């Protein structure tokens, strides 16, 4: 797993202040439709000083990564994904539930996540935050799931678990939502059905159900 660290030490702050900062950052990015919001703007909206943000999160990468992780605590989607992928075994039905949970969560995080993806080409802080969720969390979860399915004999013949996980990840990535739902006008329900169908046919045995 790739880990991004800050060289400077951070200072603990109250949970209330931390939440106010992270939710202010998310709200401002939604309003501005860009991820490069200044710390002064975030501080003003959260009712804190810039120094508080700097001391609590270290740098912009630390702030953005904490922000996207905080969003994951707003619903039980991530907890449910983790529970399924950390089980001792998995069936095709477990995998379907896993995909359903992610496809339900994707529209919630999309508005800011896609801004981070666009900025990631030239913005190391945005790249760090995006990788933390899309690779270190989502892709890693798919690798655990496909590993469990492989142990149960459910993968298509000749398909290795990690390669299968990367294929699934690409099919349900937020970039696909941008291309098909935003770009081509697909309805969310159409997107969900197509992703489930394509993933099923791509990685599972014909008798998987």
Predicted region positions:
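Short helix-capping/turn signature of helix-turn-helix
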Residues: 57, 118-123
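Helix-turn-helix
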Residues: 20, 28-62, 66
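N-terminal intrinsically disordered/low-complexity leader segments
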Residues: 1-16
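Amphipathic alpha-helical linker/stalk segments
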Residues: 31, 65-98
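Hydrophobic/aromatic-rich alpha-helical bundle segments in the mid-to-C-terminal region
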Residues: 5, 150-198, 209
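Secondary-structure edge/capping motif, primarily at the C-terminal ends of alpha-helices
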Residues: 113-120, 183
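Amphipathic alpha-helical packing segments from all-alpha helical-bundle domains
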Residues: 100-116, 125-152, 162-166, 197-204
